[in-house]
Amino acid sequence: MSSEKIFLEGESCQSSWHNATAGYDETDTHLEILGKPVMERWETPYMHSLATVAASKGGRVLEIGFGMAIAATKLEQCNIEEHWIIECNDGVFKRLQEWATKQPHKIVPLKGLWEDVVPTLPNGHFDGILYDTYPLSEETWHTHQFNFIKGHAYRLLKPGGVLTYCNLTSWGELLKTKYNDIEKMFQETQTPQLVDAGFKCENISTTVMNLVPPEDCRYYSFKKMITPTIIKV
């Protein structure tokens, strides 16, 4: 993993992200936007783990961030009814629209930043949520998921619904600079924020998988990954 930081101090990509080129490489194993490493194919087992949790209650699932369709494709293999997907980048959204025509379940593609789209969605509408967007500024690098979770995740879920999420760009940095125990990292940096959002500690659980990133991965080098399961009761 490169020692170069993903974001420079004060850097923000938010205003230019939507129409920046979606750089899928020739082998479709990497996605870069504005030079940022958004997603890589080696994440597949982990993305499938997140998708399995998000689909575990069936029904209507909200996915925030489409990327390379790794989690989305897994969700479509699960026993769900509807699949709502928010994506703000033009090129990625075009790929989402093409992908949607080939899927077995009802797909509802929603174009825009989640900050603009999510407030329009009704309360108690989803059985599952998978949040995996890319941070768009240095200021929100480690915290953007909490803006969604505290502002919207709890209200969007039906009672008994499930939330899962990740912020690999943040967690990769934390596991490189501050933590060598991934469960401790989650308990100290994530769980208190989830409780603040209305979820109860006893309804927050995690599973850990072994997964070795390639040496040239710029955002994650830790050899374990963590999948949260957060239930609204």
From Swiss-Prot:
It comes from the Eukaryota. InterPro entries: GuanidinoAc_N-MeTrfase, RMT2/GAMT_Mtase, RMT2_dom, SAM-dependent_MTases_sf. Transmembrane segments: none annotated. The keyword Methyltransferase applies. One of its GO terms (molecular function) is guanidinoacetate N-methyltransferase activity. Guanidinoacetate binds at residues 39, 43, 132, 168-169. One of its GO terms (biological process) is methylation. Monomer. This is Guanidinoacetate N-methyltransferase B.
